[in-house]
Swiss-Prot record:
Consists of three domains: the N-terminal catalytic domain, the editing domain and the C-terminal anticodon-binding domain. Belongs to the class-II aminoacyl-tRNA synthetase family. ProS type 1 subfamily. The lineage of its organism: Bacteria, Bacillati, Bacillota, Bacilli, Bacillales. It is an enzyme of class 6 (ligase). Catalyzes the attachment of proline to tRNA(Pro) in a two-step reaction: proline is first activated by ATP to form Pro-AMP and then transferred to the acceptor end of tRNA(Pro). As ProRS can inadvertently accommodate and process non-cognate amino acids such as alanine and cysteine, to avoid such errors it has two additional distinct editing activities against alanine. One activity is designated as 'pretransfer' editing and involves the tRNA(Pro)-independent hydrolysis of activated Ala-AMP. It comes from Geobacillus kaustophilus (strain HTA426). The keyword NAD does not apply. Transmembrane segments: none annotated. It catalyses: tRNA(Pro) + L-proline + ATP = L-prolyl-tRNA(Pro) + AMP + diphosphate. GO terms for cellular component: cytosol. Keywords: Aminoacyl-tRNA synthetase, ATP-binding, Cytoplasm, Ligase, Nucleotide-binding, Protein biosynthesis. HAMAP family: Pro_tRNA_synth_type1. This is Proline--tRNA ligase. Its EC number is 6.1.1.15. It is found in: Cytoplasm.
Length: 567
C-alpha cells in the first residue's frame, strides 16, 4: 500500500479524553476514531490488525473442530424471557421496540439464540457433541465506557458454544478450548495468565478467565509466588487460620465515638488495632437484608456473599435503606440487637475476635468488649472476604501476591442452565429424553487489539508483534526528492510484495524526520529506509521492537526480513 494514497490520519497531540496508553496511541497513529461514547470506528490500519487477530482465532477454532456461523445481533425478547435473563440481566442489556411494539435486545452475548437454534435442529445424540462459534458485534450499555476499546458499548467478540451428552464430553471440549485460547494469546505475543474466575451473569460453575497482565487492568489477579496458582481476586479462597485469644471476656459497654465513622477513625479514637474491630455491611440479597460481618482490616467480597447465599442479585444497601432497616447510619452499624428480619452472616475471622468493637446501631456510639456468640448470634460463618497479599496460597504453595490484568477471554462450563430453561433436549441411545449439557467460550476481539497495544508500546508509539501487525515492513525514502532513492524504493516495493511481505510504502513528499516519527508511531515491525547508499544497493533495516539497525545489501533483504520477522 502506498502511504500517499492511504487513509492514515495521524495526530501529533494526545487527545484530552484518552486516559490510557493504548487508547492514546491507537488514536494518534490513525487506527481508530471515536464515533460516540464507547463506540469506535476501525480505520484501515485498525481494521487490518483486527482481521489479523480474527484470522488467528479462526485458525485455532477450526483446528479443534469448531464450526463458524453468524447469528443476528438483534434478538427477540422471547428468547431472553425463556432463559429468565430478560429480567435479571440489568441495565447493561440494550432493549428496544420495533414499530409493532415488539421487544428486542441488542445482544451482549448469544446463549439464548444459539440454544434455540440447536434445540430446534438437533434431536438425537448422534448429532452431539457440537461446537459452534461466531465473530460478531456485541452491545452492552456500559454505565461508564472508558479506556477506549477496553470498555466500550459496541465491540467485537468471538463467542463459541458447545453441546454435549455428558460431562466428560464437556470436559474434553473445555480443555481443548482452554488450550486453543492459550495458543491464540501466545500467537498474539501476549504476557497473560489463565485464572480461576466467577461466572457472573452468564452462569455456570467451572470457569477461567484469560488475563493480559497490565497495570491499567480493571481486574486484580491473586497468584502464588511459588506455584502456577492464579485466580481473579473475587474467587481466590482464603485458607488462613485464626487463633482465638485466651484473653478473658470483658464486659460489654457502649461508648461515645462522636464523628468517628470509618474503621480507621474508630480504631484510632479507641486506641486499638483495626483487627479488633468488626465491620458491618448491610446488603440487599434478592430482596431480603443480610448483615455481613468481616474483620476491620478485611474487605467484604460480594461475589463470595452471593455464592454462599446462592443468590442472584447482591447489592450494598443504600444509605436510605440502611436507615430504614437498621435505624442507624452506615458508619454506626453492628450486629447486636438487630431485627429478626435481618440475617447475620460472618467471615471466619470474626469468630476469633475477643473483646472487639462494633457499631451500636446508634450514631456516635460503638460497643467495646464485644464477643461473638455471647453478644450476638451469627446464622452462618463462611469465607466472605477478599484474599490479601501475604495470605497463604490456596494450593498450599507459597503466599499470595497481586497483579493487575485485562480480561480478554473467558471459558465456562454452563451445564444445563440454558438448556433446561429453554427445553433443549435430545433422544439418547435408549430413546429417552435428556437435557443437553453446554459450555460457552468468549474472546473480546476488539479488546484484544487494545490489550496488545497496551503491552506493546514505548515512548515513541506502538510496537506491533509481527503476527498481528498491519504490515510487515514500512518502506520509505530518506530524501523524497532523490530520483535514485525513489527508483530503488519502487523496485523493492514490488519485489517485497512478490516475496509475500505486506508492505506500507511511504512515498509521501515529506521530510525524513516526519516519516521516521510516523513510522515509530504506527509501529510496523521492520522499517526499511532507502537512503544515501541507494547507489550501492544498500538499505537500512530497523527493528522497531529493539531499535537495532542494520545496513543490508538489497540482494539479502528478503532473507534478512524473513529472519527478523520470525525471531
Amino acid at each position: 500500500m502506498r502511504q500517499s494514497q492511504a487513509f492514515i490520519p495521524t495526530l501529533r497531540e494526545v487527545p484530552a479524553d484518552a486516559e490510557v496508553k493504548s487508547h492514546q496511541l491507537l488514536l494518534r497513529a490513525g487506527f481508530i476514531r471515536q464515533s460516540a461514547s464507547g463506540v469506535y470506528t476501525f480505520l484501515p490500519l485498525g481494521q487490518r490488525v483486527l482481521q489479523k487477530v480474527e484470522a488467528i482465532i479462526r485458525e485455532e477454532m477450526n483446528r479443534i473442530g469448531a464450526m463458524e456461523l453468524f447469528m443476528p445481533a438483534l434478538q427477540p425478547a422471547e428468547l431472553w424471557q425463556q432463559s429468565g435473563r430478560w429480567y435479571s440481566y440489568g441495565p447493561e442489556l440494550m432493549r428496544l421496540k420495533d414499530r409493532h411494539e415488539r421487544d428486542f435486545a441488542l445482544g451482549p452475548t448469544h446463549e439464548e439464540m444459539i440454544t434455540a437454534i440447536v434445540r430446534d435442529e438437533v434431536k438425537t445424540y448422534k448429532r452431539l457433541p457440537l461446537v459452534l462459534y461466531q465473530i460478531q458485534t456485541k452491545f452492552r450499555d456500559e454505565k461508564r465506557p472508558r479506556f477506549g476499546l477496553l470498555r466500550g458499548r459496541e465491540f467485537m467478540m468471538k463467542d463459541a458454544y458447545s453441546f454435549h451428552t455428558s460431562k466428560e464430553s464437556l470436559d474434553e471440549t473445555y480443555n481443548n478450548m482452554y488450550e486453543a485460547y492459550a495458543n491464540i494469546f501466545r500467537r498474539c505475543g501476549l504476557n497473560f495468565r489463565a485464572v480461576i474466575a466467577d461466572s457472573g451473569a452468564i452462569g455456570g460453575k467451572d470457569t477461567h478467565e484469560f488475563m493480559v497482565l497490565s497495570d491499567i487492568g480493571e481486574d486484580t489477579i491473586a497468584y502464588s509466588d511459588a506455584s502456577d496458582y492464579a485466580a481473579n481476586i473475587e474467587m481466590a479462597p482464603v485458607v488462613a487460620t485464626y487463633e482465638k485469644s485466651d484473653e478473658p471476656p470483658a464486659e460489654l459497654k457502649k461508648v461515645a465515638t462522636p464523628g468517628q465513622k470509618t474503621i480507621a477513625e474508630v480504631a484510632s479514637h479507641l486506641q486499638i488495632s483495626p483487627e479488633r474491630c468488626i465491620k458491618s455491611l448491610l446488603f440487599n440479597v434478592d430482596g431480603r437484608y443480610v448483615l455481613v460481618l468481616v474483620r476491620g482490616d478485611h474487605e467484604a467480597n460480594e461475589v463470595k456473599v452471593k455464592n454462599v447465599l446462592d443468590a442472584t442479585v447482591v447489592e450494598l444497601a443504600t444509605p436510605e435503606e440502611t436507615e430504614r432497616v437498621m435505624n442507624a447510619p452506615i458508619g454506626s452499624l453492628g450486629p447486636i440487637g438487630v431485627s429478626e428480619d435481618v440475617t447475620v452472616i460472618a467471615d471466619h475471622a470474626v469468630a476469633a475476635i475477643t473483646n472487639g468493637v462494633c457499631g451500636a446501631n446508634e450514631e456516635g456510639y460503638h460497643y467495646i468488649g464485644v464477643n461473638p456468640g455471647r453478644d450476638f448470634a451469627v446464622s452462618q460463618y463462611a469465607d466472605l472476604r477478599f484474599v490479601k497479599e501475604g495470605d497463604p496460597s490456596p494450593d498450599g504453595k507459597g503466599t499470595i501476591r497481586f497483579a493487575r490484568g485485562i480480561e480478554v477471554g473467558h471459558v465456562f462450563k454452563l451445564g444445563t442452565k440454558y438448556s433446561e430453561a429453554m427445553n433443549a433436549v435430545y433422544l439418547d441411545e435408549n430413546g429417552q429424553t435428556q437435557t443437553m449439557i453446554m459450555g460457552c467460550y468468549g474472546i473480546g476481539v476488539s479488546r484484544l487489539v487494545a490489550a496488545i497495544a497496551e503491552q506493546f508500546a514505548d515512548e515513541h508509539g506502538l510496537v506491533w508483534p509481527a503476527s498481528v501487525a498491519p504490515f510487515h515492513i514500512h518502506l520509505l525514502t530518506a530524501n523524497a526528492k532523490s530520483d535514485e532513492q525513489r527508483a530503488l524504493a519502487e523496485e523493492w516495493y514490488e519485489k517485497l510484495g512478490q516475496a509475500g511481505f505486506e508492505v506500507l510504502y511511504d512515498d509521501r513528499p515529506e521530510r525524513a524526520g516526519v516519516k521516521f516519527a510516523d513510522s515509530d508511531l504506527i509501529g510496523i515491525p521492520l522499517r526499511v529506509t532507502v537512503g544515501k547508499r541507494a547507489g550501492e544497493g544498500v538499505v537500512e533495516v530497523k527493528v522497531r521492537k529493539t531499535g537495532e539497525t542494520f545496513d543490508v545489501p538489497v540482494s539479502e533483504l528478503v532473507d534478512t526480513a524473513r529472519r527478523l520477522l520470525q525471531s
